[in-house]
Amino acid sequence: MRLRTRKGSPRSSHGAAGRTARCKRKHSEEDEEEESPLIEEDKLPTQETGLLSTIKNFIKGSTNKEDRENPAKKSRVERDFDNNLITSTPRTGDKPSKPIARVRRKSQVNGEATAYEVSQHMKQNGKLEDLPCTTSPPRTTLLGTIFSPVFNFFSPANKNGTSGSDSPGQAVEAEEIVKQLDMEKVDEFSTNTATNGASYPSPGAPVRTTASSWLEGTEDTPEREIPPLTAPVSPESGYSSAHAEAAYEEDWEVFDPYFFIKHVPPLTEEQLNRKPALPLKTRSTPEFSLVLDLDETLVHCSLNELEDAALTFPVLFQDVIYQVYVRLRPFFREFLERMSQIYEIILFTASKKVYADKLLNILDPKKRLVRHRLFREHCVCVQGNYIKDLNILGRDLSKTIIIDNSPQAFAYQLSNGIPIESWFMDKNDKELLKLVPFLQKLVELNEDVRPHIRDRFRLHDCLPPD
């Protein structure tokens, strides 16, 4: 009898050996995965099946999901940029609103890059980095929130309304406009605000405004002729012809501070009864008070780096640190040292306290030159415009003088105001020195200062007729 030999045993041993090899390979792969997961990912085939692949995919998927739900913590600057703090511009494709469109014109006047030319991003040090962008709509910056904001005309609907008649919607809209506007003010009617003894234009003469030669980095802008102040003014005429409106459809129309002053609404009873913000005078306090503006009157500040800045300092605003660059007006310190001997010097600015107070702490740390400081919260907000009502000082207005580059800032006490030319970078400027003799004379006369200021500067003659 012949017996058949079964060949299953070798196959079984071979299978066992295969299973042993696969187990070893499996453990080896798990060890290699623990030691070098990146290398293991490269060795794995593009499509895996089985329990190990499922576990890996589950781990990878949960990690990515966790990253998406809990992103890495960003720096303050990056987080603020995402929240659109420094730029209130709508994203590309959104139609810019009218107040934002006006900012482009003003930026050109003050020598800054226009909003249509660059899109600014934040660096880690709080500076702005210009990146070319041809499709970005106009932008507004933080300047309008910590620095002095720009004045805007009253709307035709509420031009003749009182400051107390604003509806909540109008008040909110006005505040939003102020927040959107830039800090740097246009040199409005420099002929009227000059203090070098030059004659002011008569009410019947046409007024022209041009960009001053000392404005940094600006191109010559065409002159715009303003109708005579004796001509009747209506909201429809708006001080501009139809041709001018077509040419400057998206630009900022020329701002007439005296038209603004003429139509400013009266103060409300609540505003008139505000408590004085300053302490009572002491025996050592000079009898006369001199109120000084800050931005473009004594200094020029910018968030953009200025190569000729006299000093720089950081400002913490809404959890973000910004670097402020400061230029000092020529004869700034000499003027303050001489005037502080005969006047009670009071700084009154429409800027935020977080910026202005820190700057004054650097310039006058012991308060030897400036006795008191008033900020935006001490101004009167009239339909979105900050006006400096001198009644809040608690001082005798017959012995109080205010110097400001914006006449509309002292609209309620026009006879107490001395206009001065806006300053940005002119190193040959002497406007502060030119005021010294007149200010000294007012103290020597020891009379009501208002008639002398009115006769010298004749600001009332610049007001449009009724």
Swiss-Prot record:
Domain FCP1 homology: 283-442
SUPFAM superfamilies to which the protein is assigned, alphabetical: HAD-like
Acidic residues composition bias: residue spans: 30-39
Naturally occurring in which organism (per UniProt): Xenopus laevis (African clawed frog)
InterPro entries per UniProt: Dullard_phosphatase, FCP1_dom, HAD-like_sf, HAD_sf, TIM50
Top EC category: hydrolase
Function comment: Probable phosphatase.
Pfam name, any one: NIF
A GO molecular function held by the record: phosphoprotein phosphatase activity
UniProt-recorded name of the protein: CTD small phosphatase-like protein 2-B
Keywords in alphabetical order: Hydrolase, Protein phosphatase
Stated family: Belongs to the CTDSPL2 family.
Sequence segments annotated as region (Disordered): 1-111, 192-242
Signal peptide segment: none
Keyword Repeat in annotation: no
Gene: ctdspl2-b
Keyword Hydrolase: yes
Comp. bias (Basic and acidic residues): 63-82
Domain of life assignment: Eukaryota
Ranges of compositional bias, category Polar residues: 46-62
Assigned EC number: 3.1.3.-
